[in-house]
């Protein structure tokens, strides 16, 4: 049996590790459920099912384009379109690093961000989540935001592409 600690020590074991998991275990991991389906009172987007037999850790997911979105106090950063209006890629990166620092403090492993959709209509209700109508600029800013998260130890899950 290959454990998670063995995979961390030797990443080449990842395929064999996944290959030993049952369809049920894989499905439970894919839907972000812990001890059943759904979310708990903390407000996170989900948790990956822990398999004690294999030593898999708990991964906590939260939305977070503009901060760590939980049912508790958090830092609210400027919306993505505001950050993008500066054309400052370093600012997008630093926003990601700051969100990562708060995520780690709140024991969140994965931030469901950045949102990388494009502005297609000025009346779009979710435009504040997206960086720009320009695909190149949106990609640069979203990429730097995500890199800031990941360089500081929090996984980034780009969405709304």
Language-model segments: what does each one mean?
Residues 1-161:
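Glycoside hydrolase catalytic-domain context in secreted enzymes
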């Amino acid at each position: 049996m290959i454990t998670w600690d063995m995979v961390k020590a030797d990443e080449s074991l990842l395929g064999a590790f996944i290959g030993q998991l049952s369809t049920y275990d894989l499905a439970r991991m894919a839907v972000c459920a812990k001890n059943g389906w759904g979310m708990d009172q903390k407000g996170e987007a989900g948790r990956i099912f822990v398999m004690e037999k294999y030593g898999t850790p708990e991964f906590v997911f939260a939305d977070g384009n503009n901060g760590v979105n939980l049912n508790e106090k958090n830092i609210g950063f400027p919306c993505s379109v505001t950050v993008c209006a500066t054309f400052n890629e370093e600012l997008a990166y630093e926003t990601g690093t700051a969100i990562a620092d708060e995520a780690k403090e709140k024991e969140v492993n994965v931030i469901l961000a950045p949102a990388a959709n494009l502005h297609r209509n000025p009346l779009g209700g979710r435009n504040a989540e997206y960086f720009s109508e320009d695909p190149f600029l949106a990609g640069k800013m979203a990429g730097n935001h995500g890199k800031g998260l990941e360089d500081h130890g929090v996984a980034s899950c780009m969405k709304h592409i």
